[in-house]
Structure formats: C-alpha cells, structure tokens
From Swiss-Prot:
Gene3D superfamilies: IlvD/EDD C-terminal domain-like (3.50.30.80). Belongs to the IlvD/Edd family. It catalyses: (2R)-2,3-dihydroxy-3-methylbutanoate = 3-methyl-2-oxobutanoate + H2O; (2R,3R)-2,3-dihydroxy-3-methylpentanoate = (S)-3-methyl-2-oxopentanoate + H2O. [2Fe-2S] cluster binds at residues 122, 195. Pathway: Amino-acid biosynthesis; L-isoleucine biosynthesis; L-isoleucine from 2-oxobutanoate: step 3/4; Amino-acid biosynthesis; L-valine biosynthesis; L-valine from pyruvate: step 3/4. This is Dihydroxy-acid dehydratase. InterPro entries: Dihydro-acid_dehy_C, DihydroxyA_deHydtase, DiOHA_6PGluconate_deHydtase_CS, ILV_EDD_C, ILV_EDD_N, IlvD/EDD_N. Keywords: 2Fe-2S, Amino-acid biosynthesis, Branched-chain amino acid biosynthesis, Iron, Iron-sulfur, Lyase, Magnesium, Metal-binding. It comes from Pseudoalteromonas atlantica (strain T6c / ATCC BAA-1087). The active site is at 517 (proton acceptor). It is an enzyme of class 4 (lyase).
C-alpha cells in the first residue's frame, strides 16, 4: 500500500517543525493524515485566458476540503503568445513551458504533495503542467479556464464571427479602412477565456479530455458560462477520490502514466488530426510522452495522419465555426464518438472518472436520445456580452447540433476530407520530419513548387513581405528560428498573416524550423527537423533554389541532387561559423542561452537533451 507522500512532512516527532509551519498555513490536528493536494493555478492579468482564474483555485480548494482532503494553492507563470507575438518577447514563449513544468515539479516535490489539480488554459501552460504531471506520476486532474466567446461584428449588413487573427489581418490589409479595422479589433476578443478558434490553447485543453485526464466539457465549455463552475467543483471532489483509490486501495490505474498510456496518446493524436488542431499540439504531445516515458513518436503521428479523417473544421480553418459551436455539437466527446464509430479509437483506455473512455463517450454522446443530460449540457452557449468574469451568464442554444452530415462535427461518411487536418512531411530539408496543418491549406496548393526566398530571422521575412518583395510563387524560408537556433522556436503568425493580407495566402508557401500559432492557416510548414542550428538540411537551401512540397506524398525538399547538397554541407562545416545565421543581430539573454544549451529539435518535442545531463 503506497504511503501518503505528505506523511514525510506531517508524521513523526522529528517533523514537529514542518507541522508547526503547516499549522501556520491553517492546518489543524485533524488535517494531518489527510491527502495534501496541490492546486496548481495560473492566474495572471496579462492573459485573457487566465484573467478570470484568480478565484478558481479557491473554488477547487473548498471542494477538495469538503471531500476530505487538504488543498494548498500555488501559481505558475503564464505567457500570452498573442501579446508576445511579432517581437523579441516570442523568444520566451516555448521556454516558459519548461519553467512551468519545473515549477510544478519543484513545488509538488518540495512539499511532498499527494496529488495535483492543474488549473490551466493557454498555450504553454497546459503543456507545461502536463509534462510535470507525467514526470511526477501522482493523481492529477486538469480543469481549464475555458474558451472565450467568438467575437461578432456587422460588416456589409451581415453579422460575422471574429477571432484574434481577423484583427491581425485587418490591421495590415489595405482594403480595410481605419474604421473597419478598429471595429474588428474592438470586437475580436470580447470575453475572458482562451482565443475562440481551434488554436493551441483550445487544442491542448481538448487533448487532455482525450488523454483521459480531464472532465467532459473541459475543452469546449465557454469560460463565461455558469455550467463551467461545476467542472471546477467536480475536479476537487474527484481528485480526493483518486487519492483514496491510490493511497488506500493501492489502485495504480489512477496514475497519469497509466491513464495517459500509449493508446491514450494515440487517441489524443487522432482527435487532434480529426479536428485540425494546432501544429503546436504535436510538439507538446511529444514532449509529454518523453516526460512520461511513453514510446510515442513522430512516426506514430505520421501513421495516424494517413488514416484519420477530418471530422471537425473550426476557425482559423473556416470562419463558420468556433469553440462555442464545437461545444454545441457535443464537444470533444462528440468527435471521439465519431472516431469510435469509425473504428479509429481505443475505447478501453482509462479515465479520471474511473471508467473507460468508451464508457464516458457513451454517457455523453448527444446523438443518443437517452442522454438527455448531455443534450442539456452541450446546449450551453454564448451571451454576447463583453466581460472578464467567469460563470457570468447561463444562455443556452435552443437545440444541440446533432447533424453529423452537415454540422460542425461530421461522421466519417460525411467527413470534411478523408485525410485528417495534420500531416508529417519528410525530405532533404527535414530528414526527421516537419508538420503542416492541412486543415488550413487550400487543396489547390497541396502540391506546390516555388522559388526559395531565404530569411534568417522572422523580422527580416516580415519586412520583405510588407515591402512586397515576396511575390506569388515564392516559398519563404525562415531558418535559425528553431528551439536552439532562435533560441525559443518563435511562432510565425505574423508572416503568415501578412501573406494572407497581401493576397498571397494561396499563392505562396512558408517553411521554417520555427513553429506556428494555432491561428495560422495557409501552406505553412514548420518544425523542420533537425533545425538549421543542429545541422538540418533547411540550413543548406540557397536563395532562388527550386523547392517542392507534396502533401499527398508526404514529401518536401529542395530540388537539387544529393551530391550538390553534400557539397553545400561540406562547405558549411568548413566555414568560420557553421550552422549559425550569417547576418542577424539579436541579443540573447542568459536565460535563453541556458534553454538553448539543452534544447532538442522539434521532432523530440523540443524537450531538454537528457544525454547532456547524464552522470
């Protein structure tokens, strides 16, 4: 029978000092011997997805205490990728994931906590907490802050839905006047919550459901809706139950490495492909797998991407549907139900509710008339009122969206496309693979040949695009922006947004060893591995080279012979500063240099290179 980890600090005369300190936090005699549960919150006023989380930790804590546990809350950092975008702040985004993971590990292990409730929401916070949970392997439940409502504005006498990317595009589109741009900007992000499309934050919160580590509705229930309060309360109650099962009944099935096992990672990736999630999710799933010693690799993702259809199309891939529409259609469990009916899901994987994922799907599938509670739950919708407050409205759609032929979520027979929304490409510039979000690529450019335009920083590429130096048929190559080369693997949302604003969204491609925002669409290929700074082939492409992208064949490369490529490699190796940008002025802080020293390329999740830390 496993002993409570917290007993190390609460039991025995020699721990009198520790108990004295625990008492100073509010603990009483009767609390020593109860499970001490860490509530890892991520409240900050910098991030709309986290601005409403201040009271959520205490909401969970009171629920934990009512169920018989002791709750202790702490906070992690949280970076807003949208605000950090387009300047040197973006260098810090991905490295913050490792700091979040480390901070959770530090707090939980330093104080010998018995379990964790992770209150996350935006881009690097959920992945960082997931990585920590897989490292620690103690009972955990995730509960996110939820997505924001879609923005809405009236243009040409029509009400249209908006998100952050619409504001960015309008800001540089010469066809949009100042008044229209200002209206879009003021309307794009109307409430607290993670940005309203299937961007990185919402994608990751959806994936925690598929991994079995969060409750039904976690990925799709709006931040503003009153029903979301129930998820926080239930998380507090259920984590105490998981502690009871593990510490009192020796039930190891409740541990995250047993719930989020290899099959669960396949389920999560299948969901990601089916819903056309952010390419960043691949990076984060691979990182979590490494931390949990789960043998899930890019090869598995490549295999799944060839078999899983695209069942749910959401902004930025279409303006028609946002997360509130996904929720109305049955949320994550609605998509998983269609995957299950298509024979593309492992329905026997465990879940934090103590059931299999298949059982949870059956209970929450809105296409089954007997699930009246699910139909009511998934009718929760937006109020259309600007607010930063959680649980501030209780509006409901008249009906749920159960249309699997033409609705937001489709059956396999009515899929948006037979192949899913993400693909892995290989070739001489990405020997270990690269990623494209096919859900956002027009079919007319699934095969594309163009002229390489080489830029060794995102800033230089942006200047060239805005100066109209990039023309139709060009392939913009941005390199030395990987985890090590950036350092920090910046998101390239501004270059792709500006290409779209210039009318080049279907006429150009962008290839990088950096990454993309979940808001990116178009022929945008990232995560080229190995990255240029690690000797990757992307570092050998020259200005004016012909390059070819072939999504159906999963191929990408520069159109030169192996002999020419090898000659370029030898020349690079013999240069004064091999595998470094030739003319880039960028001040890199000591903190970022420390990150770069251990960073692996994207195909390994950009985690630390453990081989460099071996005894």
């Amino acid at each position: 029978m496993p002993k409570l980890r917290s007993a190390t600090t609460t039991q025995g005369r020699n721990m009198a000092g520790a108990r004295a300190l625990w008492r100073a936090t509010g603990m009483k005699d009767g609390d020593f011997g109860k499970p001490i549960i860490a509530v890892s919150n991520s409240f900050t006023q910098f991030v709309p997805g986290h601005v409403h989380l201040k009271d959520m930790g205490q909401l969970v804590a009171r629920s934990i205490e009512a169920a018989g546990g002791v709750a202790k809350e702490f906070n992690t950092i949280a970076v807003d990728d949208g605000i950090a975008m387009g300047h040197s702040g973006m260098l810090y985004s991905l490295p913050s994931r490792e700091i979040i993971a480390d901070s959770v590990e530090y707090m939980v292990n330093a104080h010998c906590a018995d379990a964790i409730v992770c209150i996350s929401n935006c881009d690097k916070i959920t992945p960082g907490m997931l990585m920590a949970s897989m490292r620690l392997n103690i009972p955990v439940i995730f509960v996110s802050g939820g997505p924001m409502e879609a923005g809405k504005t009236k243009l040409s006498d029509q009400i249209i839905k908006l998100d952050l990317v619409d504001a960015m595009v309008a800001g540089v589109d010469n066809n949009v006047n100042d008044e229209q741009s200002g209206e879009i900007e003021r309307s794009a992000c109307p409430t607290c919550g993670s940005c309203s499309g299937m961007f990185t934050a919402n994608s990751m919160n959806c994936l925690t459901e598929a991994l079995g580590l969060s409750l039904p509705g976690n990925g799709s229930m709006l931040a503003t809706h009153a029903d979301r309060e129930g998820l926080f309360k239930q998380a507090g109650t259920q984590i105490v139950e998981l502690c009871r099962r593990y510490y009192q009944q020796d039930d190891e099935s409740v541990l995250p490495r047993n719930i989020a096992n290899f099959k669960a990672f396949e389920n999560a990736m299948s969901l990601d492909i089916a819903m056309g999630g952010s390419t960043n999710t691949i990076l984060h799933l691979l990182a979590a797998a490494v931390e949990g010693e789960v043998p899930f690799t890019l090869d598995d993702i490549d295999r799944l991407s060839r078999n899983v259809p695209h069942l749910c199309k959401v902004a930025p891939s279409t303006p028609q549907y946002h997360m509130e529409d996904v929720h109305r259609a049955g949320g994550v469990l609605g998509i998983l139900a269609e995957l299950n009916r298509a024979g593309l899901l492992h329905e026997d994987t465990p879940h934090v509710l103590g059931k299999s994922i298949g059982e949870v799907i059956s209970e929450w599938d809105i296409t089954q008339p007997e699930n009246a509670h699910a139909l009511e739950f998934f009718r929760a919708g937006p109020a259309g009122i600007r607010t930063t407050k959680a649980f501030s409205q209780d509006c409901r759609y008249p009906t749920a969206d159960t249309d699997r032929e033409n609705g937001c979520i489709r059956s396999r027979a009515n899929a948006f496309s037979e192949e899913g929304g993400l693909a892995v490409l290989f070739g001489n510039i990405a020997q270990d693979g690269c990623i494209v979000k096919t859900a956002g690529v027009d079919e007319s450019i699934h095969v594309f040949t163009g002229r390489a335009r080489i830029y060794e920083s995102q800033d230089d590429a942006v200047k060239a695009i805005l100066a109209d130096e990039v023309i139709a048929g060009d392939i913009v190559v941005i390199r030395y922006e990987g985890p090590k080369g950036g350092p920090g693997m910046q998101e390239m949302l501004y270059p792709t947004t500006y290409l779209k604003a210039k009318g080049l969204g279907k006429k150009c491609a962008l290839i990088t060893d950096g990454r993309f925002s979940g808001g990116t669409s178009g022929l945008s290929i990232g995560h080229c591995s190995p990255e240029a700074a690690s000797g990757g082939g992307i570092g050998l492409v020259e200005e004016g080279d012909s390059m070819t992208i072939d999504i159906p064949q999963r191929k990408i490369g520069v159109d030169i012979s192996d002999e020419v490529l090898q000659a370029r490699r030898e020349k690079m190796e013999q240069s004064a500063n091999p595998w470094k940008p030739v003319s880039r002025e960028r001040k890199v802080s000591l903190a970022l240099k420390a990150y770069a020293l251990l960073a692996t390329s994207a195909d390994k999740g950009a985690v630390r290179d453990a081989s460099k830390l071996e005894d």
